[in-house]
Structures are given as C-alpha cells and as structure tokens.
C-alpha cells in the first residue's frame, strides 16, 4: 500500500480541529480499500485528509484559527464536503455523507459519520454531477434549467399577453 497522499489533499494543521470518524465508505456501492484516501474540503480548499484503514478511520477537519496558514478553513456551523481518492484508479470522486455534521465551536470535537458514498448521477455517471431539473431533464448545467410559466407550471407554455393576462398553456 502506498502512503503517498494526493497533492490535491494537502493541508495545514490548525489549532481548531474536529475528527469525523467514518464507519463505511463506498464507491458505487463497493467498499473502498485500505490505502484509498478520504479528504474533507471547504469549497476547493482541502482542510484535512486521512488514508483509509477501515471502519472508524478518523478524518481530521481543520478550522480557521486566525493564522494565515488556515485562512479559508472551516468556521463554526459550516459543513465540510468529502472526496475519496481511489488509488487503484488514480481518480478523485465527490463523496456524500450519510448525515451532514457542522464544524463545531471550540478547539476539538469528535463526530461519527455512518457512511460516505460516491454515487451514480441521473445520467449513470459514477461520481457525476448531473441532476434532474423540475422538468425531468438530466444534465449538469444549472443555467439551462426549465422555468415556471405564469400558470406556475414547470416548463409550461403559458405567457403574459399584450393585455397583461396569462394566456396559452393550461390557462
């Protein structure tokens, strides 16, 4: 098992810390293997990482303690996101926790996460980012989501006519 951490998972230690103990971690329903990595993020900033050693692997999550090295790290009440690095595939996936647990106020805290899962999106892509919009379209582009017409119908065809009346569609 290689112990080399992916460069994307590099972080600085802070005096504000929480440890999230992960019981199970899966990619597409298959348990990850010893040697894979789990990291916590705030946006694009890695705030902690640990190599998977099995159930109850503790993922350190660092907070902003006011020092320059921890700028952009977690603040109380914020929720970390997680990523899994599958070492045999050299692939990093977004992983979703079974429950969201906010970063605490104070210097040290411990939490338990039942599972972290990399899932298939609506397009069948493992770790993909496509989702169904209100009209049932599956894609990863939030700028083309369907709109509600003047009759409050998603993707409807009703419109405000020249007289200011909602016309067409189901009106």
Positions of predicted regions on the chain:
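Primarily marks secretory-pathway-exposed extracellular/lumenal segments that are disulfide-
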Residues: 1-171
């Amino acid at each position: 098992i290689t112990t080399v951490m992916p460069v994307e998972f590099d972080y600085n230690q802070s005096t504000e810390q929480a440890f999230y103990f992960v019981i199970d971690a899966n990619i597409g329903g298959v348990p990850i293997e010893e040697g894979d990595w789990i990291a916590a993020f705030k946006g694009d900033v890695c705030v902690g990482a640990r190599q998977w050693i099995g159930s109850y692997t503790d993922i350190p999550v660092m907070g902003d303690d006011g020092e320059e090295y921890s700028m952009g790290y977690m603040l109380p009440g914020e929720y970390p996101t997680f990523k899994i690095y599958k070492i045999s595939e050299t692939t990093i996936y977004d992983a979703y926790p079974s429950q969201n647990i906010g970063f605490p106020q104070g210097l040290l805290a411990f939490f338990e996460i039942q599972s972290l899962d990399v899932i298939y999106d609506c397009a069948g892509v493992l770790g993909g980012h496509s989702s169904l919009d209100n009209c049932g379209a599956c894609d990863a582009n939030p700028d083309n989501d369907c709109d509600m017409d003047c009759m409050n119908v998603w993707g409807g065809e009703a419109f405000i006519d020249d007289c200011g009346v909602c016309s067409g569609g189901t009106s």
